[in-house]
Amino acid sequence: MRTMSQALEQFAGILTTRFGSRLARVPSCCGELTYEVEAEHLLEVCGELRDDPECRFEQLVDLAGVDYLEYGNAEWTTNEATGSGFSRGRATPPAGAPAGRAATAEVGRRFAVVYHLLSVTHNRRVRLRAWCAGVEPPLLDSVTAVWQSADWYEREAFDLFGVLFRGHPDLRRILTDYGFVGHPFRKDFPLIGNVEVRYDPAKGRVVYEPVAIEPRTLVPRVIRQDARHAPQAKDAADHG
């Protein structure tokens, strides 16, 4: 009986034969094969992974955007010394690797999209990573023509990371407000946000205002003085 690792290696050989240089293997994680595909080959490779009898990845389980802006860098700068840091997930690069970057992230590339595929036919999973073409905006072809389930997943990656998916039938925000400024999962997005939103009863509508808090380091809780603490709001709550 083959072990799981033997079965994975056998299937890895099948993928190498079938796709050649279009798929580049990277270190596996959690017993799941992981490959990189260049942006120009993404659509054709995904279509073949779905249709090839030895692959039959009929289902896109999930896709997610990734921002590698700070990946592999040292601990965050703080105002005070810390003996243990924040247990930040970072990899130690091997000898000869560029300083400050982990081995699995490439210098000069910032945004990527990761696809998790499932073959119901063969009971297999595989993970793909495609680096976006360009940085601002990051671009990739939409895979909605291959897997319809990619529709809302790609909208989420666009909303949170700003990835533009060419050929998507309805690429618009899905989680944030329509007037939201920026993409909140980017590593350079301010933790305090860009604006504050509240309902103004006098105007009868939602209003946008400058952020009233300041970013601070090593402060787990910030007590804000905003509209909820205004005297009229407190009186209304007390007598409501």
Language model features with spans:
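Terminal low-complexity/charged segments
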Residues: M1-G240
